[in-house]
Amino acid sequence: MTAFLNDFSKFYGTGEKNEAGQNLEEFLELYDSRKYETPSNTTDAVIFAYEGESCDSIDGLKVLLVKRSNHPSIGYWALPGGFANMRENLDETARRELEEETGVKGLVMEQIATYGDYDRDPRTRVITTAYMAVVPENAVKVQAGDDAADAVWCEVNLQGVSTEERENDLKCYGGAVSDLEKQMEYHYKLHVKNVSRGLDTEAEVVQTICGELVREEHFQVEKAGEIAVDHSAIIVQAILTLKKRL
């Protein structure tokens, strides 16, 4: 099989042959990527908008959502995003999908998280990389396109509900939690609203943190409302990330 890259000169290593007696060219010629089942990769973008001259608080923020016109989660609201092309870097995917679905382009975008639970998509194994951007609301024009039935700014409000401390939870660190480690659970309600579109929904998300110096952090959707898949968890993580910087 032809190598995926035309120029693979930086992959020679020491130039020695492998145990099968193959040099790099021979190895690539026989390598069959179809032999292994592999995940698909997507990006999703959390685009926040603020009013006024600067973004000083998470209060009053809006988030850009698209309405899905096809399965899965048809009719629900989602973050703009989609599948990465084979010869496209993830940053390029995030910008392309954002422009195709909403018409928004030219933003500074930061990669904030990866979501890879095996059961997050019924079509196939899909791992998504989440991006975040913040813009003045009047600086961009939103117009739905591609497979988005609609694209709008939505009011978003995050409310902390409760905090729980647990010890020796076997879910943390794959069941190898030290007696000294604590597991903290933070419960949130995410309210998303757009009056003109008849959208008024609430999601419940749990943030779990294990460890201190090295932290294992997860965001899990307990109740999705009308927000597709795990996108409410991604939005909550983005809001909390932004809140730390304001």
Where are these regions (language model features)?
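N-terminal leader/linker segments that precede catalytic domains of diphosphate-processing enzymes
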Residues: M1-L246
